[in-house]
Amino acid sequence: MKLVWFVYESGSRGFKAIRKYLDKFIGFFTTDGYVVYKVYDNEEHPQQLRSSCLTHIRRYLVDALDEHRELIMWFIDEVGRMFAQEYESKKLGESSEERLKRRLKHTKPIMGRIKDKFESLARNKFSKLGVLTVRALKYMKNEW
């Protein structure tokens, strides 16, 4: 079942509003980097499996394009390769099991390359990178 659900309670998407709905949820859900979702990133909530929104990550990267075009385009292209795998899976009408196999075979290596590149930059303390580039990379790190 595919569902998009935005939770606002009394105009808030704060901790209480989110917990009211997601504590009973079983499965995967995708979020932005809003801190209240981080409660589901630990062993306390084994049935709620949070993943990060690649569109949000890509948006931060696009914001940094003018600072370090070649570097940022490398990350954007890698994210695009992940999107292409999802598109292909959808186009072929793959089952959940087939999609998982595709992700393990094709998407996992892409994520490995992204992580390696990111960690290399982090070891150098993001030296000589602009403010927006560092912001994009830190957002990505926090969502990893």
How would you name each of these model-derived features?
Residues 1-144:
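Catalytic center-proximal scaffold of phosphoryl-transfer enzymes
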